[in-house]
């Protein structure tokens, strides 16, 4: 069996692991903290961003949020970095998604925003890597529990989608 098929077959286990984590005390505290940010903050919109499959998760999440009358937009991290960063204000809740937590555009965007906003922009990072740059730079981080991945995003895509949902 090739590695790609093996990782696809591991998806149910990784979904169970991720759900188990968010049913634990630590996981519940992380989710509650994000919900508290949105409900108590003075935000006028949520902007979700990422690259590649992380951006595809952003698009799906923004669509779901708008169905619940939450003002949400998905913007590719490269577009935000180079052309559209002016849409991000202190009243924006930014959800930055990167399975590795090291996507160049996402990290560079956060560096630039940190300089421009002096850390007043609230960032929720969603990543599979707890020790990543994204996890360190985010106001709060939500962790995927997909384990190690050697091929294209399979386990991380599905667990990221679950976490953002």
At which residue positions do the language-model features occur?
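Glycine-rich phosphate-binding loops that contact phosphosugars or nucleotide phosphates
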Residues: 40-165
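Cofactor-/ligand-binding subdomain signature composed of acidic, glycine-rich
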Residues: 1-41, 161-162
